[in-house]
Amino acid sequence: MVEKEEAVISEEEAAQYDRQIRLWGLEAQKRLRTSRVLLVGMRGLGAEVAKNLILAGVKALTLLDHEQVSSEDSRAQFLIPSGSLGQNRAEASLNRARNLNPMVSVEADTENINQKSDDFFTQFDVVCLTSCSRDLLVRVDHICHKHNIKFFTGDVFGYHGYMFADLGEHEFVEEKAKVAKVSKAKQEVEDGPEAKKAKIDPTESILVKKKVQFCPLKDALEIDWHSEKAKSALKKTPTDFFLLQVLMKFRTDKKRDPQPSNYQEDSELLLQICSDVLDSLGVSPDLLPKDFASYCFSEMAPVCAVVGGVLGQEIVKALSQRDAPHNNFFFFDGRSSNGIVDCLGSK
């Protein structure tokens, strides 16, 4: 992880981030202002995450994407101006991204992430990957875990979206209401069950230091569902976890995501992959509904907004070391407008 310089908040920055400083404190904002973030994949979800991080006030954000702007990007990617077809996605997003907050250094990198060396990632405090293959996600997470770099990933497939975090051993502070001390004399006067309960003082709070351990992505994805412990937890596991496994396998096999222009063929392929994946995991073939394939095509802007909001929030929490992080998955189902946080894998 990159060495941190001493944080100094100028008067101009204090005015710019006044609301945030009131919300999570000066020290948390100082940590953000010394943080460097790598964001990979500038599709709809990437645009949402970029917006949230730039407005939060990180020190520097690198947008990495080697792909060109396509007609599908207009569905959810609001940082790319119209008339940008054929341009590099990261470069096309640069101007609007910079205009969101001139105090944040925003740069574009047009190189393919697969060509990046392990050392490339060590210059960042947080690495966030979107629209990447499973093998690449596992590789980059391994690098980040080894070098104590906060790792995040997320994707949106139609009505469905997810995010995952691997923060290694993460320390944070949480604000708790202060327990008011009650004098012995008052306890004797106010005798009874209520008098013995802790008195919460809503006007005062204290910061409590905590520590939590995260597991690597590889462990979270490779759960042995044949074990008795896993079988007992299966009923509580979000079905979107298994949908994610299916969509990752599709991306690995086809080197792309399901395309609306190829709906019939891709729907049939998704059903076949679903059968194979669930069988290999040793879970029921009926775990996913038969019509699941109808709801996981393309990126939907509202789903990108929700997942991007959560993903951006979690990155800010990790960098500022303020409040408990989501450990380790967040799944969102746009059909039911339901979001679930679940901890999967060994710790």
UniProtKB/Swiss-Prot annotation:
GO terms for molecular function: ubiquitin-like modifier activating enzyme activity. Pathway: Protein modification; protein sumoylation. Pfam families: ThiF. It comes from the Eukaryota. SUPFAM superfamilies: Activating enzymes of the ubiquitin-like proteins (SSF69572). The keyword Mitochondrion does not apply. Keywords: Ligase, Nucleus, Ubl conjugation pathway. The keyword Ligase applies. GO terms for cellular component: SUMO activating enzyme complex. Its main location: nucleus. It is found in: Nucleus. One of its GO terms (biological process) is protein sumoylation. Heterodimer of sae1 and uba2/sae2. The heterodimer corresponds to the two domains that are encoded on a single polypeptide chain in ubiquitin-activating enzyme E1. Interacts with ube2i. The heterodimer acts as an E1 ligase for sumo1, sumo2, and sumo3. It mediates ATP-dependent activation of sumo proteins followed by formation of a thioester bond between a sumo protein and a conserved active site cysteine residue on uba2/sae2. Belongs to the ubiquitin-activating E1 family. This is SUMO-activating enzyme subunit 1.
